[in-house]
Amino acid sequence: SPMYVEKFNVLQHPKYTEKLCKELAERFRDQNVELVIGPMTGGILLAHEVGKALGTRAIFTEREKGVMTLRRGFKIEPGTRVLIVEDIVTTGGSVQEVVNVVNQSGGEIVGVGLLVNRSGGKAEFGVPHEKVQALLNLEVPTYKPEECPLCKDGIAMTERGSKHIK
């Protein structure tokens, strides 16, 4: 991808994180959310702040042996109205994993809230598009290594940021 979005430039500031999460929460206020869930790492902060704004419980998923799961005694009771939150979506893979966890638990997904959707709305995770809200929508191309123009030019993307690109 020719663009990198560093979420922690914003998330390091609690007042901005709170403001963004309140805006995200407002978009789902009428959905009677009972639980907010996000994937580790950035999703933990978002779930907490959105849950606080909605007055609900907030939990997170994490990988165990490569599989996204609920740990630490977290549970989703069948029928619980769940809002999934994530910081940045490129392919939708992490959100899809959280969707799977919620579905396996019998929860009802009422929405997916994103800070940034880099897929231009193309990421699919089994949730109807009308239930997905992003504060910022971008259309950023994502390449397989063999198709990447930077890779073809010999520019190794091994570090975050763009300081090594000339």
Where are these regions (language model features)?
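PRPP-associated nucleotide enzymes
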Residues: 1-166
